[in-house]
Amino acid sequence: MVTETPLEKPLDIGEIPLPAMEKRATEVAILLKTLAHPARLMLACTLAQGEFSVGELEAKLDIRQPTLSQQLGVLREAGIVDTRREAKQIFYRLAEDKAARLIEALYAIFCAPEENL
């Protein structure tokens, strides 16, 4: 039998001022919209594990280089990933802690191996 851990009770909506809630909702909607593509979601999940070169990402995810570059560009433009150049190689890593935490939560919910009890 799988026992689910109860979620922490979120703050009462009345505790967050409406303008702050609207701002947060907009930020989250933009982040979710950016991640709402299978290739970008796979990239973000992989980058949650650490920094990878374009070649490593291409091999690991079996995404062709033109598609990979396009999707990494979208993530970079949204501020979700940062880059580092070393000679001719470009390395990518998650830039935003909130994105990393969201990816970790999505992984735990949808991708983690189920326990056999």
From Swiss-Prot:
What the entry lists under PROSITE patterns is as follows:
HTH_ARSR_2
Location of the DNA-binding region in this protein: 54-77
Report the GO molecular function annotations: DNA binding; DNA-binding transcription factor activity
Q: What is the deletion mutant like?
A: Cells show altered biofilm formation; on glass surfaces and on tobacco root surfaces, it exhibits a greater biofilm mass than the wild-type.
InterPro entries, per the entry: ArsR-like_HTH, HTH_ArsR_DNA-bd_dom, Metal_resp_trans_reg, WH-like_DNA-bd_sf, WH_DNA-bd_sf
The keyword Mitochondrion is assigned to this record: no
Q: Does the keyword Transcription regulation apply?
A: yes
Superkingdom, natural source: Bacteria
The record's listing under Pfam families reads: HTH_5
Query: Would you indicate the residue range of the signal peptide?
Result: none
The alphabetized UniProt keywords are: DNA-binding, Repressor, Transcription, Transcription regulation
Residue ranges of the HTH arsR-type domain?
Answer: 20-114
Q: Which PANTHER family match?
A: ARSENICAL RESISTANCE OPERON REPRESSOR ARSR-RELATED (PTHR43132:SF2)
What NCBIfam families is this protein classified in?
A: HTH_metalloreg, sulf_sens_BigR
Biological role: Represses an operon that comprises at least itself and blh. Binds to a palindromic AT-rich sequence spanning the -10 region of the blh promoter and blocks transcription of the operon.
What protein name is recorded for this chain?
Biofilm growth-associated repressor
Which taxonomic lineage is given here? Bacteria, Pseudomonadati, Pseudomonadota, Alphaproteobacteria, Hyphomicrobiales
